[in-house]
Structures are given as C-alpha cells and as structure tokens.
C-alpha cells in the first residue's frame, strides 16, 4: 500500500527525544538469564546451505526466541540474533503531508522480515498511567506508550528508536511481535507483506478508546475506520445511537445454540431433514406472517397449529410460569400496537411449544447428511487381556498400560509445577514460565501421547494376530439363553 509521503522531503523541526538502540530500565534491573532457562536449538550449520544456520525451521525461531550467544550450535553463523545485533532494515525518516513524521523503506523488505525493534523506557503499568495523564494535561499530542506484558509498558516519548515514528494504518503493511531475548520480552516491527522501496511503513495501533478527545484517523486506507479506536466498544457506545429495530442488535442475527447440540451447516440429509440455513430462512420468512396476524396466533395457540406455524424453528426454549403466561395474554389483548404484536408472537410460540412435545436432540450433522457416532467409553484393558490366549500377548499389553499410567502421572505433576505461574500471570503466563519447565511440559505431553499410541497399537496387533481365548461351557449356555448378547467368533 502506497502512502502520501515524499521520501525526498527531509523536513525539519524533528521532535526532541533521546535516540536509543535498546530498552532503558529505570525502575528495575535488567533480568539475568539463568542457564537452565536458555533454549538451545538443534540446528547444524552447513556451508553449502546458508539457511541451515537458524533459519525458519529453527525451533527457537518458531517459538519467537532468540538464540543465546555461546550456546547456539551454529556459533557465529547464527542468524537468529537480530535483536541483539540490531540487524535492522534500511529506512528513512521523512515528513508526511498532514500526518507529521513517518518512516519509509529504502530497500526491498520481504514478508515476515524483521524491520527494527520498538525501544523505549520499560516502566510499570502504574507509572504508565501517570505519564499518560501528565502528557494529556500538558498537551503532548505524540505519546508513544505501548503494552509489553501484564505488568509493564514501553514509553518511547522521551527515549526511543525510529520505530516511534511509524504511523498507524487501518490497512497496515507491518505488525508488532513479542520476542524472548536473553530472558527479556522485547517488541519488534515485522513486515506483514512484501514492501517495496519508497513505501511508508505502518502498523495497526489497536487503540482502545476509554474517553476524551476523538482523534481522526488520516491513514487514507479504503477501509479506514475514521477515528483511532473506532472499533473499540467504548467508542461505539459513546458515538452511535442505537434505535429500536436496528439490525445490529437484531436477535435474529445472533447465533443462539446449545453447546451439546452445536450443529454445523451441511447438505440436506437423505431422509429429508433440512440444514440449519434452510431452517433459519423459514424462520425469517415466517416472522412477517406472524407479525401481521399476531392476535390470531394468540387464539390459535391452544388449537392445532397451522402449517405456517410448524415451519417456525425455535432455537431456545424457556419455561415460563403460569403468572407470566397470563401477563403476556393480558398485554396482547389490551394493546394492538407493534409492541403488542411482538409480545403476542412470543406468547403464541410459548403456548405452541408447551402444548406440543419437545423435539428430541439430534446428533451433529456431517457432510452427506450422516451422523457421527462418538464413542463414550474408554478401552477396558483388563477385559482385553482376558480375551488374549497367550501369556506373551497379555504381558505386552499390560506393560504398555503401565507405561501409559506413568506418563499421565508425570504430566500431572508438571502441571502442578506450572500452575502457580499461570495463576499469577494469567494471560501472560507464556512470558513468565521458565523455558526449561516449558520444554519438560512438551516432552511429557509427547511421552503421554506416545504411550497411548503404543498401548492401542499393541491391543490391535495382538487381537488381530493372537487367537482368542476359548470360552467355557457355562458362558456359552448363558449366552444361548440371551439372544441379544454379543457372541464371539473363533477362528478355526
């Protein structure tokens, strides 16, 4: 996306700030990375393949973690230390018409490429709120405070990098990402798409409006929201007036469903059942008829329902008391306004549902109109072992069962170790849990899945290849008297 900026226009009156190349910690000391928390990748550098040195397939790159110098197997050839080495893309600070200063690319930037770090003063959220109020009181228009984690923020107003000049856009070509660098969480600017030279860089501020002046957005995008934070709930509640009948709050457009009966849109089944979309269309087409004949519905509710009423699909049913039913009946008879039509329609639907038997729960429909039968019980290993004739087969299944139990116990104990950090840091737990503990959790989860796979594979293999233990005479006689009992077939 091209913006209205001239890279050849240098401009003047650069805002006063201190340029820094890494975050400044004033209220606390820099975290010292513990050796047990260092994440070591498994990359091996190949001189014939330059991308082998911690490229896109590096485990640390995948988890947004930079390699620690001295611990990476690729050594000095490691390419996953861009934050530490300040390997930024070439950019230029320019003056944008009507939008202050901005940053443009001076080279071709690939999608996903690291552009630069957003640096500033790392402060607590309490201090960030104080500074925001101070900036507003003194009329500071350009405040650069962004969220770092649940307890800290980055303020680039007085100290910062060139990333502080990147403007907002409703259709951005960049985005912010959090990376773990030597034990600290740092924010980087990355390209969302390929960016050509002389193109302005922009990312979505995700501004949340809580009151005060409304700042008009000047990004110029086709789908521009008009104001910063226009999509936030507070902005919409303060700006727009919701009138009766506004389709943005229409109940018909709100998907109400029971989680136990979560139905997906599918093709009509072979037995003639219509899909969810067809039922909703019938519901909408029927409402117009119900509104025009609201008083008639009140009288017909106790009698046999008409074909038109049978097409109405009620998604949620609430049990009403007899007093509520009488109140609805009185309201529908006293007033013939549009409001009465709505009340009468609801009353008619409730009376109709009360007089009829409730529909049975249907299974979740799948493609082709077939219903998937989900198993409700786990495999009973004890019963499986009794069916196996050889001692070797029984011992093998029991061995894998014991391994599965040990893996489950190990995973449960690790969760008890991680849980305090999750409860303390809530949504930012991924930034606070030690890397070594996270690696143990992943390893324990994989071991549990492998143990389950080995167990069930052993069961299937032994049942298919091992003769079934013959049943005694008493069991056969008991089965002969029960026609519905499942009988085992023995291979001869």
UniProtKB/Swiss-Prot annotation:
Residues 84-206 form the SET domain. The keyword S-adenosyl-L-methionine applies. Signal peptide: none annotated. GO terms for cellular component: chromosome, centromeric region; nucleus. One of its GO terms (molecular function) is histone H3K4 trimethyltransferase activity. Histone methyltransferase involved in regulation of flowering time. Required for the expression of the SOC1/AGL20 gene. Required for histone H3 trimethylation on 'Lys-4' (H3K4me3) at the SOC1 locus. Prevents trimethylation on 'Lys-27' (H3K27me3) at the same locus. PANTHER family: SET DOMAIN PROTEINS. This is Histone-lysine N-methyltransferase ASHH1. It comes from Arabidopsis thaliana.
